[in-house]
Amino acid sequence: MKLKKYATLALSAILALTALTGCGNQADNGDSKKTSGSSKITAKVIEIDLTDEEYAFGVDKEQEDLLKEVNDFIAEIKEDGTLDEICNNYFGDGTPQAVTSGTLDNSKDQLVVATNAAFEPFEYTQGDSYYGIDMEIASRLADKLGKELVIQNMDFDAVCLSVGQQKCDIAMAGLTIKEDRKEYVNFSNPYYSASQRLIVTSDNTDFDSCTDAASIEEILKAEDSSVKVGVQTGTTGQFYCCLLYTSDAADD
């Protein structure tokens, strides 16, 4: 089983960052539509990987036993098909399962999960319930450990920090394994492969002749200030863009 997720950099008259996800295959022809009133905005994905990443969970450094339990659980759900089943709820014909959070209570045996529930289909909310790949994994992990699940929803920048400060046990938020985050958490074994890709308006032909990441980056660096890139703070998309344009400035 190979899981692949594409977090895409979106390019239009104004660039914005969105998340496009897939599980081992491409959905339709890569086009998507957004409707605002009577107008339609159609987008397409440039099918070239700009980065290769792996997602993992960030565990409290003081809880070595929990790290082992998490790694064992990841291996188990990969082996028995549970991870495929969960992904199918979001990328296939399955039904997303609602996950309920308990209330934080230090007198109880709880698994406290730090997340940023604004990253569909990995974590998001509908009403009082949580949904997403990470949230369903969290629910099953808590059951496996015999603990009550408590989900702490916070800004993405605070997710790893809250675990590092022992306010939460584990970070489950579509986290790319990065060296700077290791200051706060011990990463589990990876459970998901990911990549950054560019998404543009369907009538944009600037990148049609591109064959690799270098050719895309050459065009991006040549854009003037009228073209803007929107990113979620603290994500790999932001780090990629900062590195790309910082490197460009250094070369000048």
Language-model features, listed with the residues they occupy:
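Bacterial Sec-dependent N-terminal signal peptides
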Residues: 1-7
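Conserved small/polar residues in nucleotide/adenosyl-binding loops
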Residues: 245-252
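Bacterial signal peptide processing site
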Residues: 24-26
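Secondary-structure junction motif
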Residues: 207-213, 220, 228-244
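Immediate post-signal peptide segment of exported/extracytoplasmic ligand-binding proteins
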Residues: 34-39, 95-130, 214-226
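Acidic, polar ligand-binding/catalytic clefts
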Residues: 40-51, 139, 143, 148-218
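C-terminal motif of bacterial Sec signal peptides marking the signal peptidase cleavage site
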Residues: 18-22
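Extracytoplasmic small-molecule ligand-binding "clamshell" domains
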Residues: 55, 65-73, 77-93, 105-175, ...
